[in-house]
Amino acid sequence: MDLDADFLLLHLSDSALPTGAFAHSFGFETYMDAERITNAEEFQDWLKVLLKVQLTSSDALAMRMFYATPTASELKRLDERLFAGTPAREVREANARMGTRMAEIVAETYSVPLIIEYLELIKNRELSGHPALALALATHSMGIDVDRAIHAHLTATVSSLIQNAVRGIPLGQMAGQRVMFAMREHIGAAVKRSAMLDAIDFCSGDPGLDISQMVHETQRARLFMS
């Protein structure tokens, strides 16, 4: 058992990591405003779609593709494609902010090949930054299996969104925990599904999700930045 690898995985996939994830709804606030998400069940339905479509074909597939070709040129290509493949401006900006913070945390705490170069390219505005790629750099350097790395990232993302829903909808704390437990099988399925996707599937979207994320940009009263 590699305890250092386990520590890195638990540390960087902690939903409390200061990346700014608490400030983003990734579109569920638009459904709240339209009264289409009013309770735990409706939120869970939305979360399952986000996980199955957007997170699987973008975050999970990007991590898997980097593991297959862990080079600086592939990192650059994936960062550019993730940015270009995200229709909603707020979501692009959210991923860039969180990706920058994740890269800064990794650079500050772990000796990871490519992370300094990645962070410099982000700060020079040559790349945008994405949390899934920053995490993949760290987990790959520690020899952590790609499925474990993807599972940890998706679990952290789902957990952060549930915490935001608890505050925003609002949901009770135990209702949030029930949603988290119910999502475990969907997270596992997303990891498996990402292994079946090809490059042509990269950043596949869902019209409803994409539109709700774009509508949020003009929503007058809101709690979240996306």
UniProtKB/Swiss-Prot annotation:
It is found in: Cytoplasm. GO terms for molecular function: nickel cation binding. The keyword Chaperone applies. It holds the Pfam family UreF. GO terms for cellular component: cytoplasm. Keywords: Chaperone, Cytoplasm, Nickel insertion. It comes from the Bacteria. Belongs to the UreF family. UreD, UreF and UreG form a complex that acts as a GTP-hydrolysis-dependent molecular chaperone, activating the urease apoprotein by helping to assemble the nickel containing metallocenter of UreC. The UreE protein probably delivers the nickel. Required for maturation of urease via the functional incorporation of the urease nickel metallocenter. This is Urease accessory protein UreF. It comes from Corynebacterium glutamicum (strain R).
